[in-house]
Design a protein with these regions (language model features):
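Structural recognition of the beta-strand scaffold that forms the well-ordered cores
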Residues: 39-42, 69-72, 94-98, 169-174, ...
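Active-site beta-loop-alpha junctions enriched in small/polar residues
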Residues: 44-47, 73-75, 100-103, 174-178
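Aromatic-lined glycan-binding groove of carbohydrate-active enzymes
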Residues: 82-174
Length: 269
């Protein structure tokens, strides 16, 4: 804008958009600090402005040591950003895991043309949300297998230091409204997403997370997931329907095969 251009000229930073951005951030930070308020924002506020845009991984030290809270969101599998929250936490920043590949309710779970939502962060199903290990994202063997993540990729990623676990203060789900055209679609995106997310956010870690042997961990994961999804399908959804009624649910279509003249079908819940 002409105002920004004049400001940059007056402050001898013509063409340096990172400097302009940091000046703006400083004004916001100082204003909030004067009210004893904590500055919060998407983790983009700590990333350098480059042509990579939202795929950038270079962290500025501009706010190093300052009291800010980062919501770390863009972590599509294989995109080089799964470990960003650990990088921030290891640098001392307080963070909230807001993963687009698991905690965005508007992400569709497959290529079904009847789905309403987006897929720019991959296809995220309910198991993707449930299997997130907040403190070790690659401990999730389901997500690793589903997205063909290599051993080399995992080994090159930053790990969270045990001394910095307290810098991850929680998780957060998001729902964006670009494709929400009516109340039914809103219900559809919330249910049963909010049930699965609440289990992840408020319950203690499932047993599979602490199983050291990889094969045994996968067996335990599948067993616990099967138990949880049956609880949703047989108890939780019928209870909610009985109490509230009239809600729209996102229930993925069943898969089926015909074998020996019999139909075999499966369902998500």
């Amino acid at each position: 804008s002409p105002i920004c251009n004049k400001f940059m000229e007056d402050n001898s930073i013509v063409g340096d958009y990172n400097a302009l951005y940091e000046m703006m951030q400083t004004r916001v930070y100082n204003k909030l600090s004067s009210y004893n308020a904590t500055m919060t924002g998407w983790d983009d506020i700590l990333l350098k402005l480059t042509e990579k845009n939202q795929s950038e991984t270079q962290i500025k030290d501009f706010f190093k040591g300052d009291d800010i809270l980062l919501f770390v969101w863009k972590n599509d599998w294989g995109g080089g950003r799964q470990d960003m929250i650990y990088k921030y936490a290891n640098l001392g920043y307080k963070t909230v895991m807001s993963n687009s590949s698991a905690f965005y309710f508007d992400m569709v779970d497959d290529k079904d043309l009847d789905n309403v939502g987006l897929s720019w962060s991959g296809y995220a199903d309910y198991k993707d949300m449930w299997t997130v290990d907040v403190f070790d994202i690659f401990n999730d063997s389901y997500g690793v297998k589903k997205n063909n993540i290599s051993k080399e990729y995992i080994e090159s990623s930053e790990k969270l230091k045990s001394t910095n676990r307290d810098n991850i203060i929680g998780i957060q789900s998001q729902i964006w409204s670009e494709t929400i055209r009516n109340e039914d679609i809103l219900d559809y995106m919330f249910m049963p997403n909010i049930i699965v997310f609440s289990q992840k956010a408020w319950s203690k870690d499932p047993k599979w997370i602490s199983v050291q042997d990889k094969n045994e961990r996968e067996i335990t994961l599948d067993y616990e997931w099967n138990k949880f999804r049956n609880t949703i399908g047989q108890r939780v959804l019928p209870m909610i329907e009985n109490i509230y009624g009239g809600l729209s649910y996102d229930l993925p279509k069943p898969g089926g095969i015909i074998k020996n003249d019999s139909l075999y079908a499966n369902s998500a819940f």
